[in-house]
Amino acid sequence: MAMKRRDIILEVSLQLFNDEGEANLSAVDIANELDISPGNLYYHFKGKEEIVAALYGQFESGVVALLDDIRDAGDTLEEHWLHLYVLLEHLYHYRFFFRNTTDLLQKYSAIEKRFRRMLEQQYQSIRTMLGQLLNEQHVAGKELDYVLIDELADNMMLIYTHWFEFQNLRKRALSQHPFIQSAIFQIMTLLMPYMGDQQREFAAECNLLYLRDKQP
């Protein structure tokens, strides 16, 4: 089935925003890329602000569904690793939202509250996940300071929200898979002090994959 013009506009806009940055593009640039007139673009979207809002709606819907999956996941590190990987895939697909995020939210006030609410939902889901993982470790007999859950969740959120910009600042243009592997590796290093032997074995396997992919 042929894509609707509106969907094509959103798909092309997303690609442009991801590749060149939202701030560097105008509605006319998008129209030129689509080889349509600005008037034709205006028929579907009354400017770039509506395009950004529509893309955010897609992004938000996907995140909410994935967070539900994370909350419903089991207690094992393997299950949570898979859900985190899929979530990072989704964030990567809409990565322009994480390039100069503060400036973008100031520019598009219509999505600011929704974005901050979505981040809080991510934080709570990650905190729930950590509680499940640490609870499992506690059953294994190790003493844990559960106050650290908040700090661990904060640090994981820092990776989620700033890993894109951090890689850009270091001029590392990573494709999707290496980017996600590097982010997962950082998250694993945060969790390693709280892992049991079985969890460490799985983490070591994941890290070997990361190091293999990292090699030129």
What are these regions (language model features)?
Residues 165-216:
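C-terminal peripheral helix-coil segments that are non-catalytic and often amphipathic
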Residues 111-138, 147-165, 182-193:
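Amphipathic alpha-helical packing segments from all-alpha helical-bundle domains
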Residues 68-96, 117:
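Hydrophobic alpha-helical connector segments
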Residues 99-101, 114, 142-143, 169, ...:
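Short, hydrophobic secondary-structure boundary micro-motifs
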Residues 5, 9-12, 152:
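N-terminal positioning helix adjacent to the helix-turn-helix/winged-helix DNA-binding module
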Residues 57-63:
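Short, basic, alpha-helical segments at the C-terminal edge of helix-turn-helix-like DNA-binding modules
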Residues 92-113, 129-134:
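Amphipathic alpha-helical segments used for helix-helix packing
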Residues 8, 16, 20-50, 54:
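Helix-turn-helix
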